[in-house]
Amino acid sequence: KEGKVKISKQSPEGKEIILAILHPGEVFGELSITGQEKREEIAIATEDAVICMVDVKDLHMLMEKNPKFNMSITKLIGFKLKKIQNRFESLVFKSSEERVSSFIKELAEEHGKAILGNPEEKLIQLKLTHDDIAKLTSTSRQTVTSTLNALEKSGVILYDRRSIFVKQLSKL
């Protein structure tokens, strides 16, 4: 309902990968409908958050009685599966720098606000550190810093701690 939640996973050695940063209205834990009781991911509120919880039995009942709701859940799972597939392909086929650029483009398309109706310009107002972006793209913080600096130097983005202004979306 409110706030942001970071979904992550840690290796036995303590290395963290951020799977998602969720915004108000986004859902997590939906795979519990498949019978998976124990989750390995960690959900942490990164700012004050209001979270609604639905019992799995109630969710099953809603899905059985409401075909539109059932379809919405199916679409949600399909959308998340597609994002995971895209991320996997990115890890396999793209360089670290390309992963950072692709991530910025994805953020702009999903969370960016259009500027004066120009489809090339998007303002992303998310508080993400270089370390957060590194953990979301499976790169190092240094790679994120150098990639963002290169994108800024080439006029593709403007970046500060609170926002990313994408000036040329098609160049990402």
Protein language model regions, located:
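Glycine- and acidic-residue-biased ligand/ion/polar-headgroup-sensing regions
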Residues: 1-8, 24-25
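Structural motif
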Residues: 4, 48-50, 132, 163
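A short beta-strand-loop-beta hairpin characteristic of the jelly-roll/cupin
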Residues: 5-17
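A short beta-loop-beta micro-motif enriched in histidine and acidic residues
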Residues: 15-17, 37-39, 121
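Cyclic-nucleotide recognition modules
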Residues: 20-78, 82
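Polybasic "coupling" helices that flank or enter modular domains
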Residues: 46, 67-136
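Phosphate-/nucleic-acid-contacting segments
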Residues: 109-172
